[in-house]
């Protein structure tokens, strides 16, 4: 929290913490996920740079894709806009391009904003949730 405040990122609201099996390999430790709603005057690029800096400060190391990591901060939505840009060859896209298929993103987001609408597809969050399978509901729990 102090790292966010130090970087002029203010927490407006926060979901419960959600536990899910590691993905795609369930032999790894479980993941813990939370969605926070923030207020900031930072641009998308500056916010992206800041969250990458925070990940590094708390101990994130380069690892193979989908391997367990100490911290993974994604920008799910940025001011309700659909944006794409590049920074040093890395794609930055909001809303997050795979968010609608991830129960660990959608469920906590729904907890914070039951009327959220996907900025790109214009699909309501209720409709996104209704597309999940039963196993997507049983694989996640509030802790």
Descriptions of predicted regions:
Residues 1-43:
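Short, surface-exposed acidic-centric catalytic microdomains
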Residues 23-31, 45-48, 53-143:
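Flexible, gly/pro- and Lys/Arg-enriched active-site loops
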């Amino acid at each position: 929290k102090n790292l966010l405040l130090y970087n002029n990122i203010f927490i407006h609201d926060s979901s419960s913490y959600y536990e899910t099996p590691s993905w795609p390999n369930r032999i790894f430790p479980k993941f813990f996920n939370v969605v926070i709603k923030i207020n900031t005057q930072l641009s998308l690029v500056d916010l992206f740079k800041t969250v990458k800096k925070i990940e590094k400060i708390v101990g994130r190391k380069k690892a193979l894709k989908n391997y367990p990591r100490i911290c993974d901060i994604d920008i799910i939505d940025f001011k309700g806009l659909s944006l794409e840009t590049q920074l040093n060859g890395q794609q930055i896209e909001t809303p997050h391009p795979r968010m609608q298929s991830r129960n660990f993103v959608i469920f906590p987001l729904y907890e914070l904003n039951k009327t959220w609408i996907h900025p790109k597809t214009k699909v309501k969050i209720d409709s996104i949730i209704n597309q999940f399978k039963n196993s997507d509901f049983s694989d996640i729990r509030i802790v």
